[in-house]
Amino acid sequence: MDVKTAFLHGELDEEIYMEQPHGFEDKRYPDHICYLNKSLYGLKQSPRLWYIRFDTYVLSLGFVRSEFDACFYFTQLENDPVYLLLYVDDILLISKSIIKIQKLKKDLSREFEMKDLGKARKILGMIIERNRSDCFLKIHQKPYLEKVIAKYGNMNSKSVKVPLAPHFLLSKSQSPKTDSEIVRMETVPYANVIGSLMYAMISTRPDLSYAISLLSRFMSNPGMDHWLALKHVVAYVKSTLDTGLCYSKRKDVLELVGYVDADFGGDRDCRKSTTAFYFTYGMNYISWKSQMQSIVAMSTTESEYIALSESVKEAMWLKGLLSECKLCDSSPIVFSDSQSALCLAKNPVYHERSKHIDIKYHFLRQHVETGDIKLLKVGTEDNPADMGTKVISSTKFKHCLDLLFVG
């Protein structure tokens, strides 16, 4: 569902004045200003006021607001619960009961001017495809990515199998240095393409996570080598427009499982490492991240330990969200291919080589000791998080995507 003129529903809680709109001045009082009774588009307060207005009404209907996501609401969970997700003025309703959904639609339409878009087929540029007979659902962004490619031209017609190739050894030393190089790169839509692909990456394309994470480090001053690497990513996207997230009933027991990995000193400029983690629920992909670490790790063990700590933060948030809906009772399982990092997390003994690690990363040990999280070993060849930390071969890349049911 879509809320029409959502920001106009907000109730102002302070005095705000504005000039009379051009063309609508009062002939009797042309020098007067207007006192606002309701919020308007353009006010910095409008988004917040709209949210407060919506939140107050939804709670009055008996919904519970999630403690882990302020835009996620649900009803009592005993009998066919209803889930409501809000994104600004776009609303998704989920329930097994059509009657409950229809009633909620009527309640919302009575309070706000709504547009009923029917069954969810598209939201925020994401296409939702269902096959109910096979209990299969796929989310992809093919139309959005086609528009991106059309907007920025056919930058590379060559078909490629991986987002980045091994010969792209990128660093800030490749940034433009002369005035002519700077002027030349000013005509290149580097940041625009990165931003467009980043939206796809965080929504439905985890296969782009490492490439976009790496290339975004050069957005302030990209060089021609960076641009050529980005064109390679676009060529990969053009070759894989149908790729998306595939969901189905793959296991009878729904478990929250994560995979984590880190390179060591992979950044060629500052020698910081890269963390990557990927989470599944019932063997269905739900969360991912590839990001450069904030500090320089002094060993492979340290970089893997930091990555484990970051992944556990995500695991605890996901567990809280799922437990709140009574969808997850067991402790999350996180797999790592670093035996030394796992030992450091499970057996927190004093060690000369690890005593310097910042205390903020050691909260991982607390969750391991209390049983809130389970850490297990996985072989490097079967760790899909490997694709989020470095450039890998096309064979290994496809294997990682298959492990996560991305296709």
Where are the regions that the model predicts?
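RNase H-like nuclease fold core
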Residues: 197, 258-301
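C-terminal reverse transcriptase regions that engage the nucleic-acid substrate
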Residues: 40, 88, 116-245, 379, ...
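Structured nucleic-acid-interacting core domains from mobile-element enzymes and related host factors
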Residues: 235-260, 326-327
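Secondary-structure capping and boundary motifs in well-ordered enzyme cores
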Residues: 76-80, 182-193, 201, 222-225, ...
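Polymerase palm active-site segment centered on the conserved acidic dipeptide of motif C
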Residues: 64-68, 93-145, 150, 327, ...
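Mobile genetic element proteins and their domesticated derivatives, centered on retroelements
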Residues: 2, 18, 42, 54, ...
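Metal/cofactor- and membrane transport-associated sequence elements
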Residues: 1-113
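RNase H-like nuclease module associated with reverse transcription
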Residues: 122, 127, 218, 255, ...
